[in-house]
């Protein structure tokens, strides 16, 4: 069973050792970069979460508050180590994250930007209910802006 856990002095080295395929490196920060972003965005309630399966760290996510219109949770980074991809862990972890944020209830939606060529990521986000907003960010014209709305 997938669990989301806080990053701390006991598990951060496991997270830093995570890796993705060479192609995916074009879409994601390195794990140490994700942890660093969490620190940089700490004033925006940034949270870096380890993704664990049966106690083993298999991925990492970074979510922060986005207080502009529309105010929402901003899923900045989401990665599953290449050894654990295509096993349903990403979908399950994403669902767990959405449940956690929904219970928190600060915002009505979650935003994520995904590179148009990252088909497997796009499928995963759409599978759990994210929808393309049609918005194209001038700073990231190769990305689709997807939004998940809580009921």
Predicted feature descriptions by range:
Residues 70, 88, 120, 141:
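Residues that form or flank phosphate/diphosphate-binding pockets in enzymes
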Residues 9, 91, 116-119:
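Alpha-helix N-capping/helix-start residues
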Residues 87, 104-108:
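Short coil/turn segments at alpha/beta junctions that flank glycine-rich nucleotide-binding fingerprints
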Residues 55, 59, 90, 129:
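Conserved phosphate-binding and hydrolysis motifs of nucleotide-dependent enzymes
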Residues 108-119, 127-128, 135-151:
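C-terminal "cap" of GNAT-fold acetyltransferases
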Residues 2-83, 96, 100, 104, ...:
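Acetyl-CoA-dependent GNAT
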Residues 80, 86-99, 123, 127:
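Conserved acetyl-CoA-binding loop-helix of GNAT-fold acetyltransferases
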């Amino acid at each position: 069973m997938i669990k989301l856990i806080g990053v701390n002095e006991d598990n951060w080295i496991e997270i830093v050792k995570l890796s993705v395929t060479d192609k995916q490196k074009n879409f994601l920060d390195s794990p140490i970069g994700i942890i660093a972003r969490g620190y940089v965005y700490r004033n925006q309630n940034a949270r870096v979460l380890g993704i664990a399966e049966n106690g083993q760290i298999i991925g990492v996510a970074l979510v922060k508050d986005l207080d502009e219109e529309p105010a929402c949770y901003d899923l900045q980074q989401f990665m599953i180590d290449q050894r654990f991809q295509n096993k349903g862990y990403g979908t399950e972890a994403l669902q767990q994250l959405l449940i956690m944020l929904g219970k928190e209830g600060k915002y009505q939606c979650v935003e994520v930007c995904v590179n148009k060529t990252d088909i497997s990521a796009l499928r995963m986000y759409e599978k759990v209910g994210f929808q393309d907003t049609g918005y194209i960010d001038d700073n990231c014209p190769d990305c689709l802006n997807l939004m998940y709305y809580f009921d």
